[in-house]
């Protein structure tokens, strides 16, 4: 009887045979023939642009690798030459350097691993941290969502800035342009919006294009100190980096934000700023010999920014309902909104917040021009309670600005106009908001309701800032007192009666602030201290400047208290005597010069003092007068007038002129 083979051994043999068969099949499918690879050559290179020949099948925006490891992307495709924008310093790239295709377009790493990191537009870390995992990448150029894939913008993106949330509401999925002259607070307003998202579920991406490294560092430090950096990504292409990196920076930032939007989350992109990006695009276009157009910009500059900003959208519920909001920043020259790039961006976006340099100089922060700013989404995305409370705010403030301009030429006699001016001054004080002092929607609604009810009309405009600072804690205490124990959470914004009750309670807070201000004024303290450390809310530099000025004033007061009245009077007498003697000496010198210019005038003998008719010598008279405590006429002038002179009448005229000058 033949023995039966063991079952496990048979299974192992079958498995081994199958594995061997699969390997043989794989080897049979491998092409062992040599693979040809196209290699191009650099014809010339200058200013970060390399012109390459021999790569006819290159795709637009395809990554090319130079001999030595330098990378670039194809920017323009001509019949004979390809314009390649270098992404690294061009050291080592020379004529006849070999160039190879990679077959891949520009991509950037995307995913949760970027949160809290500072990277360049290619995803390379700039914060000294570990390299990023490139398991998931996205191309920097992506198509904008189609119309059928979009939904209406209906949710507010709270910025915490009262004038923006009340008058120019930004919705999730909206593109709102922040535009203004240099140093008017554009970046500060955008950073305040980022900082306020620390209480929301919004992922923030800040893109810096052509900015100074020190300015970018201040932005990052501000977000890390006041915001939620663990939900922020910083894409930095400073002014010192290659123009190619500056050009792809906003596209890379949008791709990073789209990763979260496509997964049903909400993202916010701040591009700082598109004016510098347009200048970089013009530079690259001129270097690649594209035909220039208006203001030397190429003809596709509008299309470049349009295809970038169209990627911001609110997706439909079928695609997850995520949103991507955009706050692009643009800079104007002397407030010229009709320039080429500003008009392009205004026509592309869904509204603009215009910052005025005159308002900024008048210490109104943020310096929003109410007449030129607009949000084309507006009330559709505004909270119903905030929309109801801010209904007449813009109209009242616009009328106040017009009345204020007219009242500069004369006084007001009409009581109604005076009431409008009073209301407008309170509105201006209310919308002047320090940095990093974000307000909740509940705070904004209660403030506006109290303003509409006239609770702020009786208070000084200087006390509006303390009211705004102390209101959140006051409302929290009120809500805690009105909420029963173990009660479920309550939506106070949906209860109009509760909001009215909270607005009425603001009057009690106003009385307390006024009483504190009066008590502090009696004690010689500034009224602004009633709100606590308000001076520090305007930024470190301004707070330090205020502290220095206060120290100087305090030192002056200390010196004034240390000097007694008797010492002050003695110092005054000494100073007046010194000034008088100096004036006497000047008058005598003038008289001597005039006498010296007279014809036939003899030079007086300066060795010995000249005797006076009835008195001591001139030196003794001078000594007696110098010891006196009050100024007297100079003895030298008297001696000159009484001494005999061969000129007679001429001498008398000269002496009379010197006496008149001395008396003056």
UniProtKB/Swiss-Prot annotation:
Region described as Disordered: 525-664
Membrane topology field: Peripheral membrane protein
InterPro entries linked to this entry: ATP_synth_asu-like_sf, ATP_synth_asu_C, ATP_synth_asu_C_sf, ATP_synth_F1_a_nt-bd_dom, ATP_synth_F1_asu, ATPase_a/bsu_AS, ATPase_F1/V1/A1_a/bsu_N, ATPase_F1/V1/A1_a/bsu_N_sf
Protein EC: 7.1.2.2
Gene3D superfamilies, per database record: 2.40.30.20, ATP synthase alpha/beta chain, C-terminal domain, P-loop containing nucleotide triphosphate hydrolases
Annotated residues for binding of ATP: 180-187
Catalytic reaction annotation: ATP + H2O + 4 H(+)(in) = ADP + phosphate + 5 H(+)(out)
CDD domains, per database record: ATP-synt_F1_alpha_N (cd18116), F1-ATPase_alpha_CD (cd01132)
Basic and acidic residues compositional bias, start-end: 543-588, 621-639
PROSITE patterns reported in the protein's UniProt record: ATPASE_ALPHA_BETA (PS00152)
Site feature location: Required for activity: 373
Gene Ontology molecular function, alphabetical: ADP binding; ATP binding; proton-transporting ATP synthase activity, rotational mechanism
PANTHER family from the UniProt entry: ATP SYNTHASE SUBUNIT ALPHA, MITOCHONDRIAL
Subunit-level organization: F-type ATPases have 2 components, CF(1) - the catalytic core - and CF(0) - the membrane proton channel. CF(1) has five subunits: alpha(3), beta(3), gamma(1), delta(1), epsilon(1). CF(0) has three main subunits: a(1), b(2) and c(9-12). The alpha and beta chains form an alternating ring which encloses part of the gamma chain. CF(1) is attached to CF(0) by a central stalk formed by the gamma and epsilon chains, while a peripheral stalk is formed by the delta and b chains.
Protein name: ATP synthase subunit alpha 2
Species name: Burkholderia pseudomallei (strain 1710b)
């Amino acid at each position: 009887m033949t023995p039966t083979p063991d079952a496990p051994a048979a299974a192992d043999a079958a498995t081994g045979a199958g594995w061997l068969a699969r390997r043989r099949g794989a080897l049979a499918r491998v092409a062992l023939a040599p693979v040809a690879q196209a290699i191009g050559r650099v014809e010339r290179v200058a200013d970060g642009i390399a012109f390459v020949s021999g790569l006819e099948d290159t795709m637009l925006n395809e990554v090319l690798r130079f001999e030595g490891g330098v990378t670039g992307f194809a920017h323009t495709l001509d019949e004979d030459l390809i314009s390649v924008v270098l992404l690294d310093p061009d050291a080592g790239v020379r004529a006849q350097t070999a160039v190879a295709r990679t077959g891949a377009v520009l991509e950037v790493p995307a995913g949760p691993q970027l949160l809290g990191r500072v990277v360049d537009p290619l995803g390379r870390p700039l914060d000294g941290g570990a390299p990023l995992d490139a398991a998931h990448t996205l191309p920097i150029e992506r198509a904008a969502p189609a119309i059928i894939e979009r939904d209406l913008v209906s949710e507010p993106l709270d910025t915490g800035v009262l004038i923006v949330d009340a008058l120019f509401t930004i919705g999730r999925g909206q593109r709102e342009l922040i535009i203004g002259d240099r140093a008017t607070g554009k970046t500060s307003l955008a950073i305040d919006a980022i900082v306020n998202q620390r209480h929301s579920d919004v992922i923030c991406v800040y893109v810096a294009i052509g900015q100074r490294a020190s300015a970018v560092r201040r932005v990052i430090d501000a977000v890390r100190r006041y915001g939620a950096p663990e939900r922020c990504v910083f894409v930095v292409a400073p002014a010192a980096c290659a123009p190619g990196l500056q050009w792809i920076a906003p596209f890379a930032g949008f791709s990073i934000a789209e990763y979260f939007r496509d997964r049903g989350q909400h993202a916010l992109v701040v591009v700082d700023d598109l004016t510098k990006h347009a200048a970089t695009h013009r530079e690259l276009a001129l270097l690649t010999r594209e035909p220039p157009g208006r203001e030397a910009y190429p003809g596709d500059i509008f299309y470049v920014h349009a295809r970038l900003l169209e990627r911001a959208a609110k997706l439909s519920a079928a695609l997850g309902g995520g949103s991507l909001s955009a706050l692009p920043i643009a800079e104007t020259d002397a407030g010229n909104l009709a320039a080429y790039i500003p008009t392009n961006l205004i026509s592309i976006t869904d509204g603009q917040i215009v910052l005025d340099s005159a308002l900024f100089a008048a210490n109104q922060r943020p310096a929003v021009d109410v007449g030129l700013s607009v949000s084309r989404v507006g009330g559709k995305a505004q909270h119903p309670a905030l929309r109801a409370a801010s209904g007449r705010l813009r109209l009242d403030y616009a009328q106040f600005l017009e009345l204020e301009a007219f009242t500069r030429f004369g006084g007001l006699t009409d009581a109604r106009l005076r009431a409008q001016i009073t209301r407008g001054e309170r509105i201006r004080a209310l919308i002047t908001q320090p940095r990093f002092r974000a307000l909740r929607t509940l705070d904004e609604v209660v403030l506006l309701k109290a303003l509409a009810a006239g609770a702020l009309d009786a208070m000084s405009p200087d006390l509006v800032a303390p009211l705004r600072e102390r209101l959140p804690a006051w409302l929290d205490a009120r809500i805690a007192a009105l909420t029963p124990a173990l009660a479920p959470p309550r939506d106070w914004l949906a209860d109009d009666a509760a909001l009215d009750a909270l607005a009425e309670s603001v009057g009690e807070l106003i009385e307390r602030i006024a009483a504190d201000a009066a008590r502090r004024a009696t004690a010689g303290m500034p009224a602004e201290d009633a709100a606590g450390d308000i001076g520090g809310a305007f930024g470190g530099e301004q707070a330090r400047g205020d502290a220095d000025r206060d120290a100087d004033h305090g030192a002056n007061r200390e010196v004034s208290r240390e000097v007694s009245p008797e010492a002050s009077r003695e110092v005054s007498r000494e100073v007046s005597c010194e000034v008088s003697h100096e004036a006497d000496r000047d008058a005598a010198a003038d008289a001597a010069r005039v006498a010296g210019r007279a014809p036939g005038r003899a030079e007086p003998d300066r060795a010995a003092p000249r005797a006076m008719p009835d008195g001591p010598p001139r030196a003794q008279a001078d000594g007696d007068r110098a010891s006196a405590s009050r100024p007297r006429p100079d003895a030298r002038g008297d001696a000159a007038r009484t001494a005999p002179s061969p000129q007679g009448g001429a001498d008398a005229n000269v002496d009379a002129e010197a006496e008149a000058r001395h008396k003056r």
